[in-house]
Amino acid sequence: MFLNVDTSIRIRAAPETVWDYAYKPENWTASNPHEHFGLYFDSPDNLPHAGVTFTQLESVAGIRAVLHGRIHYMDRPRLAFWTGTAAYRLLGGLLTVRLGEGGVLSLIERHDGIDMAHNVYIDFPDSLRGRLCLWFFEKFLNGRQAVYDHAFRELRYFKERLEEQRTKPPNE
């Protein structure tokens, strides 16, 4: 049972500029400082590449998680596809719920910039436990909105930073 969330934003910048800024782990972590606590790629340069695994420390809907994932495909500056397993710690870590997650990060060039989208999903098991987790996540944690807000904050941060750089005079 999938919870899918699609987010997108128009950014007035070249696709390469957006890609090169967003793919740096320090910028991704900064894009949502209240919910991102670190992103580490298992590569010599600590950057994402096709086939590279990663660990992201984060919080979604107020629940801390450790996401272990893999970048399956990258086509700079257009598309990246990732999947992983997030371990959500409930009740102070007494209960851990592991859920499959994934996403597609895409940049589509438009006449006035690019549309940057991050379409993410959480895969709740098709079992009684999975249905209970999904029900609780949506009913009590407003999970769908929390996931949307989480992803949209990332995109909005990139838009604000990159468009701010475009408007600064060259000597600043």
Give residue ranges: language-model regions:
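C-terminal/domain-terminus segments
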Residues: 135-137, 166-172
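Glycine-rich portal/gate segments that line the openings of hydrophobic small-molecule binding cavities
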Residues: 40-96, 110, 153, 160-169
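Solvent-exposed residues in well-ordered beta-strands and their adjoining turns
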Residues: 10-12, 57, 108-110, 119-125, ...
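Hydrophobic ligand-binding cavity/cleft-lining segments
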Residues: 1-50
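Residue-level preference for beta-strand/loop junctions
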Residues: 1-3, 63, 98-99
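Beta-strand/loop substructures that line and gate deep hydrophobic ligand-binding cavities in soluble
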Residues: 89-149, 153
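Hydrophobic pocket/interface hotspot
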Residues: 17-22, 28, 54-56, 71, ...
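Hydrophobic/aromatic beta-strand elements that line small-molecule binding cavities or substrate pockets
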Residues: 6-9, 41, 67-73, 100-109, ...
